[in-house]
Regions:
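Acidic, Ala/Val/Gly-enriched low-complexity intrinsically disordered segments
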Residues: 3-7, 23
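Ligand-binding loop in jelly-roll beta-barrel domains
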Residues: 112-136
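Histidine-centered metal-chelating micro-motifs
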Residues: 71-73, 92, 108, 112-117
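A short, N-terminal "cap"/entry segment at the start of jelly-roll beta-barrel domains
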Residues: 11-58, 73, 139-142
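A cytosolic small-molecule/anion-sensing beta-strand core signal
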Residues: 87-88, 103-104, 122
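Glycine- and acidic-residue-biased ligand/ion/polar-headgroup-sensing regions
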Residues: 79-81, 85-91
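Conserved short histidine dyad/triad with adjacent acidic residue
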Residues: 62-77
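Short acidic-glycine-tyrosine-enriched beta hairpin
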Residues: 98-112
Length: 142
C-alpha cells in the first residue's frame, strides 16, 4: 500500500480521501481508442480524459479538429475555463471582440462567460482542456 493510502486509513473522513484514492490507480488511455463526437459548436472532439472514460471530476482533456475553411459556432461556457493548445494548422481565434492569428505552439485562455469561436484557415488540430470538465449543458450558442 502506498504511503498516501496507508495514511488515509488513519483518517477515514479526510476531505480529499476519494480524490487521492482514485489517483493511486493509474489511468492511461490512448486517443486512438476514443470515438469522435461533434460538440454543439460544430468541432469534432476525441476525449482523451474526462468523466466519460476515467475517474475525472475537475477537468477534461480532448483533441479537437476543425477542417480548413470552417468556423465553429460562436458560443460560451458559463462554468468552464478552457485552454486551447494548437498542435497543427493555422487559423484565427476570436474571443469577445478580439481576433488573433493562431499557429502550432500557441496556447489560448478562454475565460468562463467569454463568447468565442475559431476559424481554420489550414485544418486545425488542437488540445482543449476544460475545468470543470466539458459538458454540452454548459455550452450556450448565439
Amino acid at each position: 500500500m502506498s504511503d498516501r493510502a496507508s495514511e488515509l486509513t488513519r483518517f477515514p473522513f479526510h476531505p480529499l480521501r476519494n480524490t487521492i484514492l482514485s489517483a493511486i490507480a493509474m489511468t492511461v488511455l490512448n486517443i486512438d481508442t476514443q470515438p469522435p463526437f461533434t460538440t454543439k459548436d460544430g468541432s469534432t472532439i476525441r476525449s482523451i480524459l474526462d468523466r466519460t472514460n476515467a475517474a475525472v471530476s475537475h477537468q477534461s482533456l480532448a483533441e479537437a479538429s476543425v477542417p480548413a475553411g470552417v468556423t465553429t459556432q460562436r458560443h460560451y461556457h458559463r462554468q468552464s475555463e478552457e485552454f486551447y493548445y494548437i498542435l497543427e494548422g493555422s487559423g484565427r481565434m476570436n474571443i469577445g471582440d478580439e481576433t488573433r492569428a493562431v499557429v502550432p505552439g500557441d496556447a489560448i485562455l478562454i475565460a468562463p462567460g467569454a463568447w468565442h469561436f475559431i476559424t481554420a484557415e489550414v485544418a486545425l488540430r488542437f488540445l482543449c482542456a476544460c475545468s470543470p470538465p466539458y459538458s454540452h449543458d454548459d455550452t450556450f450558442l448565439e
